[in-house]
UniProtKB/Swiss-Prot annotation:
Pfam families: PS_Dcarbxylase. Coiled coil: none annotated. Its EC number is 4.1.1.65. The gene is psd. Is synthesized initially as an inactive proenzyme. Formation of the active enzyme involves a self-maturation process in which the active site pyruvoyl group is generated from an internal serine residue via an autocatalytic post-translational modification. Two non-identical subunits are generated from the proenzyme in this reaction, and the pyruvate is formed at the N-terminus of the alpha chain, which is derived from the carboxyl end of the proenzyme. Binds 1 pyruvoyl group covalently per subunit. This is Phosphatidylserine decarboxylase proenzyme. The record marks G252, S253 as: Cleavage (non-hydrolytic). Belongs to the phosphatidylserine decarboxylase family. PSD-B subfamily. Prokaryotic type I sub-subfamily. It is an enzyme of class 4 (lyase). The modification Pyruvic acid (Ser) is found at S253. Catalyzes the formation of phosphatidylethanolamine (PtdEtn) from phosphatidylserine (PtdSer). GO terms for biological process: phosphatidylethanolamine biosynthetic process. It catalyses: a 1,2-diacyl-sn-glycero-3-phospho-L-serine + H(+) = a 1,2-diacyl-sn-glycero-3-phosphoethanolamine + CO2.
Length: 287
């Protein structure tokens, strides 16, 4: 099948209906059939099960339980240098660099706006214009829990409705404004080096996006942007330490980080197309 046909079919496919159906099937307990699908998936995508807390495919009652499997203790040591921002996920670097004139690079020849990504909030986007961004793609074989790259306090969460195109490299190179048109959950944190956004982007067959404080954010979905504000002090403040889990995808997708101007410099290991490993150096706090 040609690349053009693959992209064209995505425009025609009822992506929300397909994704919700996949989500229901992935959460169903189907005994031997579930186990057979999990074993096929492990073989098809070369999933490294030796790192899982429970490496036995037959131990998972649903496909979703397998997909968001925990890793064994110590499988992903978190860099303990207080000036190092660590990778939030096992993934692959799609794009990274400066947010120039409010624009982020999606792929060669494609840009999109920080304001659109953040749900149309111009005031929020202004906090990141002139800063840095990084887009990390989680493939089907990756560990699909997302962690905190640094110590932070949750300020706001925004659900942004949208489409559910695939987010693989082929689609990123061919569908304009991909990450600003797909359904997403925007998490805004305050850190010692300024504001940081961690955006969880949905995609075809991603049955749900969850956070550790709100549980399942989507589905269900709605037609309007929804915003939750959180206290920055007091008993109800939500604080994270570097390396703590903050969310998860039930099937693969993308994480986008935005940083304020003059707050960080990316680690020299950062290159487009290079795999990332949770807990390893992502960036450094600017001196």
């Amino acid at each position: 099948m040609s690349d053009n046909l693959k992209i064209g079919l995505q425009y025609l496919t009822p992506k929300h209906a397909l994704t919700r159906l996949a989500g229901k099937l992935a959460s169903a307990k189907m005994g031997w059939l579930t186990t057979a699908v999990i074993k096929w998936f492990i073989k098809q995508y070369n999933v490294e099960m030796s790192e899982a807390k429970n490496p036995d495919p037959e131990a998972y009652s649903t496909f979703n339980n397998f997909f968001v499997r925990e890793l064994e203790d110590g499988a992903r040591p978190i860099n303990d240098d207080e000036n190092v921002i660590s990778h939030p996920a096992d993934a692959c670097v799609s794009q990274f660099g400066p947010i120039t004139d409010g624009q982020l690079v999606q792929a060669k020849g494609h840009v999109y706006s920080a304001q659109e990504l953040l749900g149309g909030d111009a005031e929020l986007a202004e906090e990141f214009i002139g800063g840095e961004f990084a887009t990390l793609y989680l493939s089907p074989r990756d560990y699909h829990r997302v962690h905190m790259p640094c110590d932070a306090t949750l300020r706001k969460m925004v659900y942004v409705p949208g489409d559910l195109f695939s987010v693989n490299p082929l689609t990123a190179e061919n569908v304009p404004n991909l990450f600003a048109r797909n359904e997403r959950v925007v998490c805004i944190f305050d850190t010692e080096f300024g504001p940081m956004a961690q955006v969880l982007v949905g995609a075809t067959i991603v049955g749900s996006i969850e956070t550790t404080w709100a549980d399942t954010v989507t589905p269900p979905t709605g037609p309007a942007v929804k915003t939750w504000h959180y206290p920055l002090s007091g008993d109800d403040v939500i604080c994270f330490k570097k390396g703590e889990e903050m969310g998860r995808f039930k099937l693969g997708s993308t994480v986008i980080n935005l940083f304020a101007p003059n707050s960080i410099t990316f680690d020299e290991s950062m290159k487009n197309g290079v795999p990332t490993r949770l807990g390893t150096p992502f960036a450094h706090i600017a001196k």
